[in-house]
Amino acid sequence: MRLAYLLLLLVAVLFQAGGGSVEAFVQHRPRDCESINGVCRHKDTVNCREIFLADCYNDEQKCCRK
């Protein structure tokens, strides 16, 4: 009986946590640069100059600064 009660309590706690609680542990970095023709460039500059030491990747044309 105690085991069933503990299992029910565990399920209730996990249900209260919900799926969104995992998102709190994932940090989303702002995208301050973008990949244009394979070159990482800053979004805010008018001339879109290249960023020194930027880490670009081609997944949905996103990139982020190191």
UniProtKB/Swiss-Prot annotation:
One matching Pfam family: Defensin_3
Keyword Secreted included in the entry's annotation: yes
Keywords assigned by UniProt, alphabetized: Disulfide bond, Secreted, Signal, Toxin
Entry keyword annotation includes Secreted: yes
Cystine pairings recorded for this chain: 33-63, 40-56, 48-64
Free-text tissue specificity from the UniProt record: Produced by the crural gland and detected in venom from the spur located on each male hind leg. Is also widely expressed in both male and female tissues, including intestine, kidney, spleen and testis.
A GO term from the CC aspect: extracellular region
GO molecular function per UniProt: toxin activity
N-terminal signal peptide: 1-24
Subcellular localization: Secreted
InterPro entries per record: Defensin_3, Myo_ane_neurotoxin_sf
Function, as annotated: Does not show antimicrobial, myotoxic, hemolytic and cell-promoting activities.
Protein name: Defensin-like peptide 1
Annotated source species: Ornithorhynchus anatinus
Upper taxonomic lineage: Eukaryota, Metazoa, Chordata, Craniata, Vertebrata
